[in-house]
Amino acid sequence: MEMDKRIKSLAMTAFFGELNTLDIMALIMSIFKRHPNNTIFSVDKDGQFMIDFEYDNYKASQYLDLTLTPISGDECKTHASSIAEQLACADIIKEDISEYIKTTPRLKRFIKKYRNRSDTRISRDTEKLKIALAKGIDYEYIKDAC
């Protein structure tokens, strides 16, 4: 399965800065009934720990335009508490995905927009995003415009 353009467009416009990789995993599970093939322990450019989820030919971080670097086994010790916390969150999400979506307002809003926004509107938002990024306009401005 390919990366979903509708999720990517909404994540980068209306929901920019609101989602993380756990949210993307939850959305994919809810919308497509797909579980990740692999879990990757990573850090972002600031050294903050984050779990990334690998699917057939894409990762959850790609929906958010995040560049994550996988950590080595030795580095796992440094991030042990974050690993435990995020794995526990992932397990809670997987246990009852529909309840998790219902109790998380931003994901509930995302699902509603995903299901109710027309392909034309999402395509238009994606075009605005491409044009704005080419001109060097900030994501926050784009989010407000969409």
From Swiss-Prot:
The keyword Nuclease does not apply. It is found in: Host membrane; Host cytoplasm. Induction: Expressed in the late phase of the viral replicative cycle. Pfam families: Pox_H7. The keyword NADP does not apply. Keywords: Host cytoplasm, Host membrane, Late protein, Membrane, Transmembrane, Transmembrane helix. GO terms for cellular component: host cell cytoplasm; host cell membrane; membrane. This is Late protein OPG112. It comes from Vaccinia virus (strain Copenhagen) (VACV). The gene is OPG112.
